[in-house]
Design a protein with these regions (language model features):
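Extreme N-terminal starter segment of soluble prokaryotic enzymes
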Residues: 1-4
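Hydrophobic Val/Ile/Leu positions in short beta-strands of Rossmann-like dinucleotide-binding domains
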Residues: 6-7, 32
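N-terminal Rossmann-fold NAD(P) dinucleotide-binding loop
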Residues: 14-15
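Conserved N-terminal Rossmann-fold NAD(P) cofactor-binding segment
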Residues: 33-74, 305-315
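Rossmann-like NAD(P)-binding element
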Residues: 54-115
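Rossmann-like NAD(P)(H) cofactor-binding subdomain of soluble oxidoreductases
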Residues: 90-156
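C-terminal substrate-binding/catalytic lobe of Rossmann-fold NAD(P)-dependent dehydrogenases
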Residues: 136-142, 151-318
């Protein structure tokens, strides 16, 4: 049984992750961490969740807090805090604003929960993962971004629905940036163990259109209902329970690269990794075709440039 802290627990994703985690058998306590001005909201969330948990005879401690000392003993600290992109705000603007929040929280985690694994969900997640790594001083395998895990689940869903096949038969993955430069690994996608390219020959399927839909998935949901909730929350909960239970699943998360894939170094990107409870995330080297390799390297350069600019901005603010 593990203690998990959710920083940004009153946000749309934060509160959904908190409730999902509270229902997991492997979680004994969830700290609903918030800013002081939002602590009443966090308390209200906990009261509401307790009522729901009682209906299912679930016993999980929910601790609303704005005190960093309550991070102590956390096995995992999830950072979801930050601003959301507003009209007229681009990814670069978002990165500069959220970097200050993430850096501050990462420093506090290092001080109060030095043995925890940091899981970053704040966007742009690949840049924010590097910022959290810098600020915490942790080993690179103990600072993990949610990366392309949700993107991979979305791609799996699209193929399953289009081909009318159970999603458990779809094995596919998205790597690279969680954003415009994501790289769907179509060359290694299989359906029931059969390469995707053989299905394409038999079924009319526009792969480029599916990829476009995948990249716009989040915006499509936001335009229709205002926010993405369940997909991100369940994807994040899946990552956390995988870390806690030590099941060694291979999931696509954002990690700091040192040449393991396509010779890319010094940047955080979504890559397939074996996750364990001690934070020993092991990156799996993979084979890609030329197109995928070039797209992955392009993603690396764009994220690297933005990351360095954000790093310089943080230095100027110190």
């Amino acid at each position: 049984m593990a203690k998990v802290t959710v920083m940004g627990s009153t946000g749309t994703i934060g509160k959904n992750v908190t409730f999902k985690l509270a229902k997991e058998d492997v979680v004994s306590e969830v700290v609903l961490f918030s800013r002081p001005e939002s602590i009443d909201n966090a308390k209200g969330q906990s009261y509401d969740m307790y009522d729901a948990l009682a209906a299912e005879d679930i016993d999980c401690l929910l601790t609303p807090s704005c005190n960093f000392e309550d991070l102590a003993g956390s096995a995992i600290v999830l950072i979801t805090a930050g601003v959301h992109r507003k009209e007229g705000m681009n990814r670069r603007d978002l990165a500069f604003v959220n970097a200050k929040i993430v850096a501050n929280y990462a420093k506090q985690i290092a001080l109060h929960a030095p043995d925890a694994i940091i899981l970053v969900a704040t966007n742009p997640v690949d840049v924010m993962t590097t910022i959290a790594l810098d600020a915490s001083g942790f080993d690179r395998n103990k600072v993990i971004g949610v990366g392309n895990h949700l993107d991979s689940l979305r791609l799996k869903t699209y193929f399953a629905r289009r081909l009318n096949i159970n999603s458990s038969e779809i094995h596919t993955r998205v790597i690279g940036e969680h954003g415009d430069n994501m790289v769907p690994l179509l060359s290694s996608t299989t359906i029931g163990g059969i390469p995707l390219k053989y299905f394409i020959r038999e079924v009319e399927i526009d792969v480029l259109e599916i990829v476009k839909t995948l990249r716009n998935a989040g915006n499509t949901i936001i335009s229709k209902k205002g926010a993405t909730e369940y997909g991100p929350a369940y994807a994040i909960s899946n990552l956390i329970t995988t870390l806690i239970t030590n099941t060694h699943k291979i999931l696509t998360v954002s990690l700091y690269l040192d040449g393991e894939i396509a010779d890319v170094k010094g940047v955080c990107l979504g890559v397939p990794s074996v996750l364990s409870k001690n934070g020993n995330a092991m990156i799996i080297p993979i084979h890609m075709n030329e197109y995928e390799t070039n797209k992955f390297r392009k993603a690396a350069e764009e994220i690297r440039t933005l990351t360095e600019d954000v790093r310089e901005s943080l230095k100027e603010d110190d």
